[in-house]
Each structure stands twice: as structure tokens, then as C-alpha cells.
């Protein structure tokens, strides 16, 4: 960036007040909550340092290009098919940090808004058919939107999630107004919303539903916010049109339809559902969002608050993927789940929302920032002894870099909320609150999570109000203590609630809260053999080594977000043995002088010497998060299972006449592969080959002169949303037609055997085995091919 615009031009467009508490009735402006020394303030400050290393002109380059203007700097190359998306996130991050006092972030925010105004003006001139109000950097904007407006979605569906991309700038402009009161950003935002209304006005409801089949971020949310700002019903109507019925209808009817859905496509939709419910009173939207939150946090989230694997919600049968896969929960999901949690708490305050917010903030969001260079994390694997990798400034412009830019500036947003005459203390965070409407200032002193107490002091003002202190769900019944000015308060509620103290407050009044933390275990959803160890709400992990941390700092490659070092064998990871699994938590012993560090004394197979510590402290290392935990009897059965598997493997080898590993160069060369537009990949460290729509691949295989043979194929058990239909031929003679569509619903390898007629083998030392996809169908990945004796 060449310079910042801080002239009278921008000063005239900026008003000192913000709109945060006007748009979100229970929130305090971010600038009225000051973080004091602690892990969250440290992360916030480091994030500002990281953010200021990015180049605004490079982030703005896609917007100038699509507006027909010469970019002032070269655009970032990574994820270029989604060009422009990080620019919107960055604008939000600048607004958030400007609101909490960063003058340089404010200058950058104002510069970006000035440049975006230039782009918006150019779009009117250069794209008169569709460009009025447009402020997007989506590659190929002219081809996408000129055809989209006519109801032709071919270019739209052939592009990488156009509305998802645009939503980031909708949100960025809104946030510059919400957090900083920037009127120019407000006008750009409302104009952009008018553009969306005009663009879709000619589409039928059926066309809208079809279009929403492409990932579109939280378009319904930002349009609902435009309604909240302007009170013009057209924005609320459009927000409802942007609400995907495929998700809204089953969720509102309490039907869980999430299996195999792309997780971060769904969460922003639901944030919009709840915003519409709040502003319109439509119970169907609220029912959808509460049910979604309940099943995601209650049944589909891991111990640190994250959800999804391979970016999708697994079925119950496929939850072992969390142990096997390296692409665990995605950081973006949790960013959006926290937004939803804030909205639900505003609609109906409930301590369970604050419990989840705390869990996800300290265990996931905080952990996704590298504590030294400030890089961001995409995936957090739960696979035993794997690791995470990090972005670097000005490289790796992933979606989770964008949300990461925002995350660490918002730590003060939910510490306190208010509703009528009530002040909610949702989180134990060292901070100061300026409740301007009441003339009250409150200071909270705590070292949480490294301490089990918090002290709140009224430092200015007086008045009658109810102070509601959270009784965390992780504190045992009867153990929370609250004192006002040194005198104990009678507590009539239990864990997972708020303790209300309604009185006349004055300067100098104190509230002391004690919240004893205990050790516990959390079971992996639907895989109860695996447990995580917790201390209070804090997930404990263990460092296990630093070997082969490939791509620890990600490069600019398309798939650089994967921690692609060696996957260490799961069966060689530590196993906890105890006849009382719950009692494992009682065998954690604190390490003297090291807060939240523990040793574990339970019997351990494949033991690794080390200490358990907060997961958010673990970086640049392989780690244990979930542990296989077995009783003595179950462990014996586990060993017997391994022995049986080895016996079966040896028996299979004895029956095998020939075998091919699809997707691997040498075996396919050895078997003289022939193919027409097939393709390969790797899942769970096993290569595969596949073909679709009449295309094929084949191998020349040895028969050993045998005529009593079958073909044994290896499949992966999840893939029921695809149409898997194909023919198997031997020497161009059909042996069988296979339909595997919806056949398996479990994340493990499956094997099928197909007998070959003897007359196709008689007198032959080799045969060509061919796999041909049915027209319009897909074979489905084949992971292994064997000729075996019957």
C-alpha cells in the first residue's frame, strides 16, 4: 500500500459513535470492554502485529481488477479462484481492532473503504447492466453476474462459491459501520444489499433454491442486518429468500439431516436463520437454529468445541474418521458457531451458551494462533500423534486465515452482555467494562484458566441492577462460591445457570467468585473407546514428538493447509488401560510450579513420557488429544482382534494369485494398465483409481493357470451421496454389473468378491480385468484389486 487516506474526505464520513449496541441489543461496544493482562489480551495484541504485516493494496487488487481499474499491487496468488474473500475478512479485522483502540487499524480501514468506494463507482460505469452497488472481487464477475441475472446459472455454478466470496465484503462493510460507525461503509453496505435484491428480483423461488445449492456464506444474515439498520422490509424479505429451505425445513422440524453435509456451508446459513428470527419473530427460523445448535454442540462436536472432518459432518457410523483423518475440525466452523451462540444467548440468555462459548474460545480459537509468529490454523486433527500447520503473513490466503484475522480481536465481545436491568458476566476474563448507559464501571480480576477465582469491583458509579454471574456447567453442584463485600451469597441455582445478585451497587463494592475446577473425561462422539482429558473446561493434550513436521509453515500451494507429514500408526499410539474408564481422570496429578500441567498414573501401553497441559499451549509438535481407553478385558480382546486380523491377512495372501495397488505407478505399470480418462487419489494413506461417465481402466492380471478364481475389490465405506455404478469385464466379457450407491455408511474399508466364470479363465495364463463406469455414473474409488482362489 502506497499511503493511507486520512484526510477531511474520510473524516467527514466517520462518526465517533458506533452502531454495535444498536444492531445487537445485548452487546457492549467492543471499545467499552478493555482486556487486561492474560492469555486473551496477549493473543489479541499479537494478532494486531500479524495483521499489520499484510498489504492492503494486494488485498484490494481483485476489487480494482473486477471494477476495470488497474490494481496498485499484485494480488495474492493463493486460492486465486476465490480472490477477494480475505479482503472482506481483513476489513472486519481492521474495524474490530480500530474499535478497541488501534489507530493504524483505523487508518487501514478508512483507506480500504475509500478504495472500495472508487471500485463501486467504477462498477457503475464499466458494468451498467448489473454493476450498480457492486463491491466484489470475485474472479470473472462480469461473466458470472451478467448471466446470473438472466437466470442462467452455468457460469455461477462453474465458479468457486461466488456468494460465499461476496459475503465476506458484505460483512466487512457492515462491520466497519457496526464497530466504528463509518457512514461511508454503511452506504456501501446498503448499496451492495440493493445490488443483491436487484440481481435476484427476477428469479423465482425455485430458482433461488437452486442457486442456494452453491455455498453462499451468510447472505441471509447480512441482508437481515440491513433491515435492522434501515427498517426497510425489502431487506428482510430478501434475507428470507436467501434462506436455504433444504436446511431450514428439516431443522425447523427437528430432523437431523446433516450427515455428509459441508459443515461451514451450513453454519453461516443458520446464523442467518437466527438473525431473521430475532428481527421478525418467526418461530420456524428460531426452532431451526436452536435445533441445529443443539445437535452440533451436543452430538457432533469434539472436546475442544470444533466440528467436522474433511470439512463435512460425518454420520454416526463414520465418526472414527476423527481418529483416522488429518483434516479434523475446521477453524471457520467454530468462528461461525460462536456467532450463532451469541445470537441465541441474546434471544434467550442461557448459561449453556456461555459454557460452549468458553469451551470453544479457550480450546479451539485461542489454539489456532501460533504464539510467536501469529500464523493461523486451518485443520485441528484429533488423530493421535499428528500435528497442525500454520499460515504465514502474505501467503496461504485460506478461508481460515480470513476468520483467523477476525477471531482474536473479538475476545471482549461476549465477556459481558446486558438485558434490561441485568448485567450478565458470561466469561471469567481479566477486563474492565464501561457501562455507559448506567454510568457504571466494573473491573474483573482473574488469572483464569490458570486460577479458580475471579474478583469484580465496581470502580465507578452506583445504581440498582441485577448482576448475573455464570455458574459454569463444569463446576460441581454446591461448589460455586460467591461473596459480596466479603459476605457469602446464598446460591439457589446449580451448574449451568446464572446466580443473580439484585441490589443497589456503589463504587467499591466487590464480588468474589470461586469456581473449583475438576478433572473429567469426554468421550469422542459415537466412538466411546476414545476419551479426552479435561480440567474444568480446559482440554488437556500431551506433546509426543517433533519428527517429520512437514509443511509446519504452509506454502502458497492450493492444498498447503494440510499437515502433510507422516501419519504415525494409530495402533502404536498410547493406550490407557483401566477397568473404570471414568476413574482415569482421578489419576491426573498436578505438576508443582506448572499451572494446568499434569502427569497421568494410569497404566499405559505404548507409553510416551510427558506431561499433559492445556491444548492451547501445544504448538510445533505432534500431540495426543484423544486416547484409546480400554478395560483389561477389552484390551485382551483388542490384542486378539489384531492377531485375528494378521491371521486373516496371511490367509488372504496364501489365496492370492495376483494383485494390483490402483493409483501406484509401479504396480499399474507392471500390470500394463489401460485407461480412458480415469483419475487417482489417496485416502487414509491408500491410493485409489476411479472413472466416471463411460470411462474405464483395466489391468492385465496373472491367473496362474487356475480356473476357480474370484475378483476381490477394496472400497471405502463412505460415499453414499454419489452414484456408484459400473461394469466388471474379463477380456471384454461382462462378468457382473455393480451398484454400490448407498451400500455402506461406515468409515472403514469394505471388501466384495465377484466370482469369475471358469470358461473365461480356461487355458489362459493372464486376463485383462476392466472396470467401466455406467453412463452418467461413477465407479467409486477402488483401493485394491486381487485375483484369489475360491
Label for each model-derived stretch:
Residues 1-21:
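Bacterial Sec-dependent N-terminal signal peptides
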Residues 20-103, 107, 142-179, 216-234, ...:
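Aromatic (Trp/Tyr) and acidic
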Residues 90, 104-154, 300-308:
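Helix-terminus loop motifs that line ligand-binding clefts
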Residues 140-160, 186-210:
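Asp-box/WD-like beta-propeller blade repeats and closely related beta-sheet repeat scaffolds
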Residues 193, 200, 206, 210-217, ...:
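Solenoidal tandem-repeat scaffolds enriched in leucines and small polar residues
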Residues 289, 355-363, 368-460, 494, ...:
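C-terminal beta-rich recognition modules with glycine/proline-rich loops and embedded aromatic residues
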Residues 462-466, 703-712:
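Extended extracellular/luminal ectodomain segments enriched in beta-structured repeat modules
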Residues 488-508, 514-528, 680-706, 714-790:
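Beta-strand-rich ligand-recognition modules
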